[in-house]
């Protein structure tokens, strides 16, 4: 009888283990499928938005001028703030862009993040996956279909944020009860959830009420900058020097920053409890790779924009061809890095050495690109150099991350910041080339600073970040060598 019970118990344990293993494998398959589907949709969304950027992101629309947010089918007046008419049109374009972009990016990133957190409970997360994807798709489609120039209609886009908040609220409640079972120590306290949701609601309320007040305090809801008391009051606060206005500004920014911090209480709680580990950051890098892939494909399209005065000379301007050598230099650096890295793999290597090699390579690339762009005035040359160099930089990052499995979380976060900066630089160069094309003739990014344009500022920032990192590593490397030498001297003295 005892043997029969023991045999039954053993069978039960084996069955439970097999069932659990099958469930994990099934959840892993579903998770990988959803991640692949989301990746394909994300890449498609970004590629289409960028290829049709002048029509979608800048609001030119499709078809005749009646379906455009600009007066003419050109971006020549984009960010022209010299008249109330252009000021209002540009404000509405920027407002539309920020609302739709925020909703699109937030929902896509949220889905990628949640797929990581719910690897074991993926089936239960499926409804939220679909709903977040639906909101992302709506935002994407509105970029292609919504081109209203009426303030009230454009301001109605904020209600997308209300829908997003309600979805977030339902997800956070679901996540709290699910995570409470798997990680009771971290999710035992529901106060963080309540604080985050309350302050998110207050921020949303501010975003919704502000446009409503704006359009209802003027003589006409169709005019935002003419005979509008709200606009006049805002201008006075920022321009009229008085103690009252100073206190209002300080109080506004203080409460805004406080509300933003408290609205992200859950995030800070996870950071403090070290839930954002190396694997989580690597998961984020996948989204960055998708974004870079879209930028890479789009830049190939950007080369097609006509610049009659920017054609490359055929043998009559040797200096320009010297500038283009930056691209060949970047490729040579990549080859040398790959050869050196492969050679090092055959011998024992330290993580500090490999990191130093990475940072030196990135610093050389960012410095050479900045210097060439600083002295070169041809947009097409800058576009070629940036296109090649950033591709090399991202390739170097990819090689380093692929070959080093035990990168610290802090370093991964820093590399992530540098990658985002590289992508932003590439996007700005692409948009600058689009705006300065013959059809649009807009030099917005070139007129921000008298001595340096926005592209050069971004490249300088990229170099500065790499230079700061290499300075830190050089000091750390010197300290390690000093400690080793000191230890060797002590050992030699003991032997004597």
UniProtKB/Swiss-Prot annotation:
Keywords in alphabetical order: Cell membrane, Membrane, Transmembrane, Transmembrane helix
Subcellular location: Cell membrane
Keyword set includes Kinase: no
Residues annotated as transmembrane: 33-53, 89-109, 127-147, 154-174, 193-213, 247-267, 285-305, 320-340, 355-375, 382-402, 411-431, 455-475
Major localization class: membrane
Highest taxon listed in the record's lineage: Bacteria
Membrane topology: Multi-pass membrane protein
Coiled coil: none
GO CC aspect terms: plasma membrane
The name this protein goes by in its record: Uncharacterized protein UU048
Species per Swiss-Prot/TrEMBL record: Ureaplasma parvum serovar 3 (strain ATCC 700970)
Lineage: Bacteria, Bacillati, Mycoplasmatota, Mycoplasmoidales, Mycoplasmoidaceae
């Amino acid at each position: 009888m005892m043997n029969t019970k023991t045999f039954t118990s053993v069978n039960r344990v084996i069955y439970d283990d097999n069932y659990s293993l099958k469930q994990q494998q099934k959840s892993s398959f579903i998770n990988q499928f959803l991640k692949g589907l989301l990746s394909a949709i994300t890449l498609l969304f970004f590629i289409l938005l960028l290829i049709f950027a002048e029509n979608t992101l800048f609001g030119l629309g499709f078809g005749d001028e009646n379906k455009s947010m600009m007066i003419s089918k050109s971006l020549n007046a984009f960010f022209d703030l010299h008249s109330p008419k252009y000021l209002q049109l540009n404000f509405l374009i920027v407002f539309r862009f920020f609302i739709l972009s925020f909703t699109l990016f937030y929902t896509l990133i949220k889905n990628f993040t949640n797929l990581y957190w719910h690897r074991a409970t993926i089936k239960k997360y499926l409804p939220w996956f679909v709903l977040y994807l639906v909101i992302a798709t709506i935002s994407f489609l509105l970029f292609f279909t919504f081109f209203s120039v009426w303030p009230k209609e454009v301001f109605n886009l904020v209600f997308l944020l209300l829908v997003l908040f309600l979805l977030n609220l339902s997800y956070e409640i679901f996540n709290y009860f699910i995570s409470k079972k798997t990680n009771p120590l971290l999710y035992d306290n529901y106060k963080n959830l309540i604080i985050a949701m309350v302050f998110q609601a207050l921020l949303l309320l501010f975003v919704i009420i502000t446009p409503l007040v704006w359009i209802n305090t003027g003589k006409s809801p169709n005019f935002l900058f003419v005979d509008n008391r709200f606009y006049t009051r805002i201008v006075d606060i920022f321009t009229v020097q008085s103690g009252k206005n100073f206190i209002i500004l300080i109080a506004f920014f203080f409460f805004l920053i406080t509300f933003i911090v408290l609205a992200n209480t859950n995030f800070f709680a996870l950071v403090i409890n070290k839930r954002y580990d190396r694997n989580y950051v690597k998961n984020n890098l996948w989204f960055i790779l998708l974004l870079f892939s879209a930028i890479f494909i789009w830049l190939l399209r950007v080369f097609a924009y006509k610049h009659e005065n920017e054609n490359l000379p055929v043998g009559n301007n040797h200096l320009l061809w010297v500038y283009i050598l930056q691209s060949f230099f970047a490729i040579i650096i990549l080859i040398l890095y790959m050869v050196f890295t492969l050679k090092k793999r055959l011998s024992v290597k330290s993580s500090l050495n490999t990191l130093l090699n990475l940072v030196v390579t990135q610093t050389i690339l960012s410095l050479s690109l900045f210097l060439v762009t600083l002295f070169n005035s041809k947009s097409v040359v800058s576009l070629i150099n940036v296109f090649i160099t950033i591709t090399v930089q991202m390739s170097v990052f990819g090689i380093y991350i692929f070959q080093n499995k035990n990168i610290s979380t802090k370093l991964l976060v820093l590399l992530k910041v540098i990658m985002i900066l590289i992508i932003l630089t590439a996007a700005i160069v692409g948009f600058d080339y689009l705006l300065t094309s013959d059809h649009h003739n807009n030099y917005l990014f070139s007129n921000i600073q008298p001595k340096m344009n926005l592209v050069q500022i971004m490249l300088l920032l990229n170099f500065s970040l790499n230079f700061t990192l290499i300075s830190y590593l050089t000091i750390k490397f010197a300290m390690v060598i000093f400690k080793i030498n000191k230890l060797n001297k002590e050992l030699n003295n003991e032997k004597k």
